[in-house]
UniProtKB/Swiss-Prot annotation:
HAMAP family: UPF0161_YidD. PANTHER family: MEMBRANE PROTEIN INSERTION EFFICIENCY FACTOR-RELATED. Could be involved in insertion of integral membrane proteins into the membrane. It comes from Streptococcus uberis (strain ATCC BAA-854 / 0140J). Its main location: membrane. It is found in: Cell membrane. This is Putative membrane protein insertion efficiency factor. It is a peripheral membrane protein. Belongs to the UPF0161 family. NCBIfam families: membrane protein insertion efficiency factor YidD (TIGR00278).
Amino acid sequence: MKSIIINFVRLYQKWISPLFPPSCRYRPTCSTYMIEAVEKHGIKGVLMGIARILRCHPFVEGGEDPVPDEFTLRRNPQKGKK
């Protein structure tokens, strides 16, 4: 199941994402975050990725936000704001 989700995100990165200007406010990008979260936390990583996408909007500062070692739907507290 993990590989299906990861391949779906990679298809998005290759074929859909290049059609639009870069807009992710975080590093790593939201799609890369989703892949890393699924690799690290399995299916729960999908929830983490969706939560990340929902926090990626013009009213947030953005910056570094790597996938945390512990499952959480919040921004990584160790790497918080710049």
